[in-house]
């Protein structure tokens, strides 16, 4: 399985888009990096084909409309993240 994922910074609200064949391991690696401390997995897509996953990651990274469309679909979830972060 291959994954395309979004991480979100609770401090800056910045979104990071990535690709991995081992999602759990990759998220842990991100969180161990100083600049990604506290970042949370907010979304992922699973693909059987590595080629399809890489294409999707590139689409999200290089075509703003694709990423904006996805973020629009996640609007309610992002608001929930904000509320949870405010409680911490």
Predicted segment positions?
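GIY-YIG nuclease catalytic motif and its immediate N-terminal context
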Residues: 1-48, 52-61, 65, 71-88
């Amino acid at each position: 399985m291959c994954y395309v994922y979004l991480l979100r910074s609770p401090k800056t609200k910045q979104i990071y888009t990535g690709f991995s064949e081992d999602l759990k391991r990759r998220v842990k690696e991100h969180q161990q990096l100083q600049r990604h401390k506290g970042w949370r997995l907010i979304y992922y897509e699973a693909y059987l084909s590595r080629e399809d996953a890489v294409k999707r990651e590139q689409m999200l990274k290089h075509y703003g409309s694709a990423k904006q469309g996805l973020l629009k679909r996640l609007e309610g979830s992002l608001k929930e993240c904000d509320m949870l972060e405010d409680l911490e």
